[in-house]
């Protein structure tokens, strides 16, 4: 079974608000992995619809975040994962003030119903269900400096993993259902005028592929991630600011690594980066992250207490 008693999930996401669970590893029963990830992202160019342009009014838009994350092994086949990021945004030019505060609390249940070894290869399937909700009363109608979109979400992801020796590939796809939000004005314009403070949020599909090297102490992988908004969104109008229900598509490439210390096998160091190569109504961001995670073995603690 591809589980690691002394290693931890690659919890650092391509999207800080949701993607903390998409690898082919399960936390062992009664093990709790927890830690923090610091992430820095910035961009000075963005896509207005499909037209790429410079961000002269705001200069460089940057986002710093510190996320607390955890993963508990209910069983070897069932994990519960959570994350809560604190985010700070800033623009190097213009008059818009940056924002800071808690973003969204996310909770994911990860289940592995199938795993089989055939010859030298191991095949496994996973199902993941996730929920997220705003953890503070931030404003969504303040893009691109808002902390998030403030929409409650529900997601379902199916994932398959193939490993032969220490080399692996993982592919997954998710549908993200987003709830409507309310904003602090009574009318707004998309493709037409809306006389309400309620904004209908479009759903999204996420497809993720990763390939790399996986051992008990080292994981290194290349990642391709595609986020596509479904029908209901619209493009940023010319020379205007973004709106929460814009179509927001992003194709990202990245690298993730995790190293488990030999002398402290419960402690792991993670790091990585990702870059937006194609997009629609999003910034062309470059993102770098690093973090530390530690595993507590509650089963071992209980056994020691019983002695």
Language-model features: where?
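Short loop/turn motifs that connect adjacent beta-strands in outer-membrane beta-barrel proteins
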Residues: 22-30, 77, 115-124, 166, ...
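Surface-exposed strand-loop-strand hairpins of Gram-negative outer-membrane beta-barrel proteins
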Residues: 40-65, 144-146
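Transmembrane beta-strands of outer-membrane beta-barrel pores
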Residues: 38-44, 84-90, 113, 131-137, ...
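Outer-membrane pore/translocation modules
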Residues: 95-199, 245
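Transmembrane beta-barrel domains of outer membrane proteins
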Residues: 25, 37, 69-71, 110-112, ...
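Transmembrane beta-strands of outer-membrane beta-barrel proteins
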Residues: 34-36, 80-82, 107, 123-129, ...
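Residues that define the transmembrane beta-barrel architecture of outer-membrane proteins
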Residues: 30, 62-66, 100-105, 123, ...
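Outer membrane beta-barrel transmembrane domains
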Residues: 47-49, 54-56, 193-307
